[in-house]
Protein backbone atom coordinates (compact mmCIF):
# COMPACT_ATOMS: atom_id res chain seq x y z
CA UNK A 1 0.00 0.00 0.00
CA UNK A 2 1.48 3.32 -1.12
CA UNK A 3 0.24 5.29 1.88
CA UNK A 4 1.68 2.76 4.36
CA UNK A 5 5.02 2.85 2.56
CA UNK A 6 5.16 6.62 2.82
CA UNK A 7 4.33 6.50 6.52
CA UNK A 8 6.99 3.88 7.21
CA UNK A 9 9.94 5.34 5.31
CA UNK A 10 9.48 9.07 4.86
CA UNK A 11 9.83 12.20 6.98
CA UNK A 12 9.07 14.37 3.98
CA UNK A 13 7.00 13.70 0.89
CA UNK A 14 7.12 15.81 -2.28
CA UNK A 15 4.15 15.31 -4.58
CA UNK A 16 3.91 16.36 -8.20
CA UNK A 17 0.65 14.70 -9.13
CA UNK A 18 -2.80 15.59 -10.47
CA UNK A 19 -5.07 17.73 -8.32
CA UNK A 20 -6.82 15.67 -5.65
CA UNK A 21 -4.13 13.09 -4.93
CA UNK A 22 -2.28 15.08 -2.26
CA UNK A 23 -5.56 15.49 -0.38
CA UNK A 24 -5.84 11.74 0.02
CA UNK A 25 -2.19 11.29 0.94
CA UNK A 26 -2.35 14.06 3.54
CA UNK A 27 -4.86 12.01 5.56
CA UNK A 28 -2.19 9.39 6.21
CA UNK A 29 1.05 11.37 6.38
CA UNK A 30 0.84 14.29 8.71
CA UNK A 31 1.50 12.80 12.14
CA UNK A 32 5.20 12.28 11.43
CA UNK A 33 5.73 13.66 7.96
CA UNK A 34 5.78 16.94 6.06
CA UNK A 35 4.05 17.12 2.69
CA UNK A 36 5.27 19.45 -0.07
CA UNK A 37 2.57 19.68 -2.72
CA UNK A 38 3.35 21.03 -6.18
CA UNK A 39 -0.27 20.79 -7.33
CA UNK A 40 -3.20 22.99 -6.28
CA UNK A 41 -4.71 20.89 -3.49
CA UNK A 42 -3.79 23.20 -0.62
CA UNK A 43 -3.25 26.55 -2.33
CA UNK A 44 -6.72 27.85 -1.51
CA UNK A 45 -7.63 28.36 2.13
CA UNK A 46 -11.33 27.54 1.81
CA UNK A 47 -12.82 24.29 0.64
CA UNK A 48 -15.62 26.26 -1.02
CA UNK A 49 -13.09 28.19 -3.11
CA UNK A 50 -11.46 24.94 -4.22
CA UNK A 51 -14.85 23.62 -5.32
CA UNK A 52 -15.60 26.85 -7.20
CA UNK A 53 -12.34 26.98 -9.14
CA UNK A 54 -11.44 23.29 -9.54
CA UNK A 55 -14.95 21.85 -9.84
CA UNK A 56 -14.35 19.11 -7.30
CA UNK A 57 -15.01 18.79 -3.60
CA UNK A 58 -11.97 19.05 -1.34
CA UNK A 59 -11.43 15.72 0.41
CA UNK A 60 -9.19 16.92 3.26
CA UNK A 61 -10.69 20.22 4.41
CA UNK A 62 -9.51 19.69 7.99
CA UNK A 63 -5.90 19.67 6.76
CA UNK A 64 -6.13 23.02 4.97
CA UNK A 65 -5.40 24.83 8.25
CA UNK A 66 -2.20 22.80 8.53
CA UNK A 67 -0.97 24.13 5.20
CA UNK A 68 0.80 27.30 4.12
CA UNK A 69 0.78 28.88 0.67
CA UNK A 70 4.50 29.32 0.36
CA UNK A 71 6.56 31.54 -1.85
CA UNK A 72 9.80 30.98 0.11
CA UNK A 73 11.01 34.54 -0.45
CA UNK A 74 7.77 35.83 1.09
CA UNK A 75 6.95 33.30 3.82
CA UNK A 76 10.55 32.70 4.91
CA UNK A 77 10.73 31.03 8.34
CA UNK A 78 6.95 30.62 8.62
CA UNK A 79 7.07 27.33 6.72
CA UNK A 80 8.61 25.63 9.76
CA UNK A 81 5.26 25.88 11.52
CA UNK A 82 3.26 23.92 8.96
CA UNK A 83 2.94 20.28 7.99
CA UNK A 84 1.85 20.98 4.41
CA UNK A 85 3.85 23.29 2.16
CA UNK A 86 1.74 24.31 -0.83
CA UNK A 87 3.77 25.59 -3.77
CA UNK A 88 2.19 28.44 -5.77
CA UNK A 89 1.18 28.14 -9.39
CA UNK A 90 3.52 29.31 -12.13
CA UNK A 91 1.72 32.53 -13.05
CA UNK A 92 1.13 33.61 -9.43
CA UNK A 93 4.83 33.15 -8.71
CA UNK A 94 5.76 35.65 -11.42
CA UNK A 95 3.04 38.06 -10.31
CA UNK A 96 3.24 37.97 -6.52
CA UNK A 97 7.02 38.30 -6.27
CA UNK A 98 6.97 41.93 -7.47
CA UNK A 99 3.51 42.95 -6.25
CA UNK A 100 3.57 41.85 -2.61
CA UNK A 101 6.58 44.00 -1.56
CA UNK A 102 5.27 47.04 -3.43
CA UNK A 103 1.77 46.77 -1.98
CA UNK A 104 3.11 46.17 1.54
CA UNK A 105 5.23 49.32 1.30
CA UNK A 106 2.32 51.39 -0.01
CA UNK A 107 4.17 52.38 -3.18
CA UNK A 108 1.54 51.53 -5.78
CA UNK A 109 -2.16 52.11 -6.29
CA UNK A 110 -4.25 48.99 -5.90
CA UNK A 111 -7.29 49.85 -7.99
CA UNK A 112 -5.88 49.39 -11.51
CA UNK A 113 -3.34 46.56 -11.73
CA UNK A 114 -3.20 44.97 -15.18
CA UNK A 115 -1.23 41.78 -15.81
CA UNK A 116 -0.39 40.28 -19.20
CA UNK A 117 1.32 36.90 -18.75
CA UNK A 118 2.82 34.61 -21.36
CA UNK A 119 3.88 31.03 -20.76
CA UNK A 120 5.58 28.26 -22.65
CA UNK A 121 3.24 25.46 -23.69
CA UNK A 122 4.68 23.02 -21.12
CA UNK A 123 2.66 24.97 -18.55
CA UNK A 124 -0.58 23.82 -20.14
CA UNK A 125 0.08 20.22 -19.08
CA UNK A 126 0.56 16.92 -20.83
CA UNK A 127 -2.67 17.20 -22.76
CA UNK A 128 -1.69 20.43 -24.47
CA UNK A 129 -1.27 18.83 -27.89
CA UNK A 130 -4.76 17.29 -27.78
CA UNK A 131 -6.30 20.51 -26.49
CA UNK A 132 -4.79 22.54 -29.30
CA UNK A 133 -4.88 19.83 -31.97
CA UNK A 134 -6.78 22.07 -34.39
CA UNK A 135 -4.20 24.84 -34.07
CA UNK A 136 -0.54 25.01 -34.96
CA UNK A 137 0.89 25.10 -31.44
CA UNK A 138 4.34 26.10 -32.64
CA UNK A 139 3.20 29.01 -34.82
CA UNK A 140 0.48 30.56 -32.69
CA UNK A 141 -0.01 32.81 -29.66
CA UNK A 142 -3.23 31.99 -27.78
CA UNK A 143 -5.07 33.74 -24.95
CA UNK A 144 -6.90 31.36 -22.63
CA UNK A 145 -8.81 31.43 -19.35
CA UNK A 146 -9.52 35.11 -19.96
CA UNK A 147 -11.02 36.62 -16.81
CA UNK A 148 -11.48 33.26 -15.11
CA UNK A 149 -8.17 31.39 -15.11
CA UNK A 150 -7.77 29.27 -11.97
CA UNK A 151 -4.69 31.19 -10.92
CA UNK A 152 -6.87 34.25 -10.39
CA UNK A 153 -8.00 32.59 -7.17
CA UNK A 154 -4.47 32.35 -5.78
CA UNK A 155 -3.49 35.85 -6.81
CA UNK A 156 -6.63 37.38 -5.33
CA UNK A 157 -6.30 35.38 -2.12
CA UNK A 158 -2.73 36.48 -1.44
CA UNK A 159 -3.31 40.12 -2.40
CA UNK A 160 -6.37 40.27 -0.13
CA UNK A 161 -4.20 39.31 2.82
CA UNK A 162 -2.32 42.60 2.58
CA UNK A 163 -5.02 44.92 1.19
CA UNK A 164 -8.06 43.85 3.25
CA UNK A 165 -9.82 43.10 -0.02
CA UNK A 166 -9.57 46.58 -1.50
CA UNK A 167 -8.01 46.16 -4.94
CA UNK A 168 -8.80 45.68 -8.62
CA UNK A 169 -6.63 43.37 -10.67
CA UNK A 170 -7.02 42.01 -14.20
CA UNK A 171 -4.98 38.96 -15.24
CA UNK A 172 -4.87 37.44 -18.72
CA UNK A 173 -2.63 34.44 -19.54
CA UNK A 174 -1.34 33.48 -22.99
CA UNK A 175 0.21 30.34 -24.41
CA UNK A 176 3.27 30.96 -26.56
CA UNK A 177 5.15 28.82 -29.12
CA UNK A 178 8.06 28.04 -26.78
CA UNK A 179 8.43 25.04 -24.49
CA UNK A 180 8.99 26.66 -21.10
CA UNK A 181 9.36 29.98 -19.32
CA UNK A 182 7.03 32.77 -18.21
CA UNK A 183 7.06 36.49 -18.88
CA UNK A 184 4.55 38.58 -16.94
CA UNK A 185 4.17 42.25 -17.82
CA UNK A 186 2.49 44.19 -15.01
CA UNK A 187 1.13 47.71 -15.51
CA UNK A 188 1.14 49.68 -12.26
CA UNK A 189 0.09 53.17 -11.15
CA UNK A 190 2.44 54.72 -8.59
CA UNK A 191 1.30 56.52 -5.49
CA UNK A 192 1.92 60.26 -5.51
CA UNK A 193 5.57 61.14 -5.03
CA UNK A 194 6.84 57.62 -5.75
CA UNK A 195 9.42 57.27 -8.54
CA UNK A 196 10.78 54.43 -10.64
CA UNK A 197 14.00 54.61 -8.62
CA UNK A 198 12.01 54.18 -5.38
CA UNK A 199 10.43 51.02 -6.77
CA UNK A 200 13.76 49.50 -7.81
CA UNK A 201 15.36 50.38 -4.47
CA UNK A 202 12.57 48.83 -2.40
CA UNK A 203 12.54 45.64 -4.47
CA UNK A 204 16.33 45.38 -4.26
CA UNK A 205 16.26 45.74 -0.47
CA UNK A 206 13.40 43.27 -0.10
CA UNK A 207 15.16 40.55 -2.11
CA UNK A 208 18.80 41.29 -1.25
CA UNK A 209 19.20 37.98 0.62
CA UNK A 210 17.36 35.86 -1.95
CA UNK A 211 19.68 34.17 -4.41
CA UNK A 212 17.09 33.35 -7.05
CA UNK A 213 15.41 36.76 -7.43
CA UNK A 214 17.40 39.42 -9.27
CA UNK A 215 16.30 43.04 -9.61
CA UNK A 216 17.73 44.44 -12.83
CA UNK A 217 18.84 47.97 -13.67
CA UNK A 218 16.03 50.33 -14.61
CA UNK A 219 14.56 50.01 -18.10
CA UNK A 220 16.35 46.71 -18.75
CA UNK A 221 14.69 44.73 -21.54
CA UNK A 222 14.28 41.13 -20.48
CA UNK A 223 13.92 37.78 -22.20
CA UNK A 224 12.92 34.32 -21.01
CA UNK A 225 16.20 33.10 -22.48
CA UNK A 226 17.99 34.92 -19.64
CA UNK A 227 16.68 32.46 -17.06
CA UNK A 228 15.80 29.35 -19.07
CA UNK A 229 16.57 26.05 -17.31
CA UNK A 230 17.44 27.82 -14.05
CA UNK A 231 15.62 28.52 -10.80
CA UNK A 232 16.00 32.27 -11.33
CA UNK A 233 13.48 35.06 -11.58
CA UNK A 234 14.42 38.45 -13.07
CA UNK A 235 12.44 41.62 -12.37
CA UNK A 236 12.81 44.76 -14.46
CA UNK A 237 11.09 48.10 -13.84
CA UNK A 238 10.53 50.31 -16.90
CA UNK A 239 9.11 53.78 -17.39
CA UNK A 240 6.01 54.37 -19.47
CA UNK A 241 5.03 57.49 -21.42
CA UNK A 242 2.49 58.33 -18.72
CA UNK A 243 3.46 60.05 -15.49
CA UNK A 244 3.17 57.93 -12.35
CA UNK A 245 2.83 54.67 -14.32
CA UNK A 246 5.48 51.98 -14.66
CA UNK A 247 5.73 48.66 -16.42
CA UNK A 248 7.21 45.78 -14.46
CA UNK A 249 8.53 42.83 -16.41
CA UNK A 250 9.04 39.53 -14.62
CA UNK A 251 10.51 36.38 -16.09
CA UNK A 252 10.78 32.94 -14.55
CA UNK A 253 12.07 29.71 -16.06
Task: Please identify what each model-predicted range represents.
Residues 1-10, 14:
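Single conserved hydrophobic/aromatic residue that forms the stacking wall/gate
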Residues 15-19:
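N-terminal glycine-rich "phosphate-gripper" loop used for MgATP/nucleotide binding
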Residues 21-37:
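Rossmann-fold NAD(P) dinucleotide-binding segment
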Residues 39-79:
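Rossmann-fold NAD(P)-binding glycine/threonine-rich loop
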Residues 82, 86-89:
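Short beta-strand->loop
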Residues 93-219, 242-249:
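Active-site-lining helix/loop region of Rossmann-like oxidoreductase modules
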Residues 220-247:
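FAD-binding beta-loop-beta segment adjacent to the flavin cofactor pocket
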Amino acid sequence: DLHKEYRRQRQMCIRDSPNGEAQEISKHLLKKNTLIDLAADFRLKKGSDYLKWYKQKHKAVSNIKKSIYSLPEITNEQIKNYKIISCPGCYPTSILLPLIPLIKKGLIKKDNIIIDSKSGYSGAGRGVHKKYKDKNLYESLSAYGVGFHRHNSEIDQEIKKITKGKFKLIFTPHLTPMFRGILSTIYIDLENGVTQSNIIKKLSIFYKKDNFVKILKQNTLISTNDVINTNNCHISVCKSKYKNKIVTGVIAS
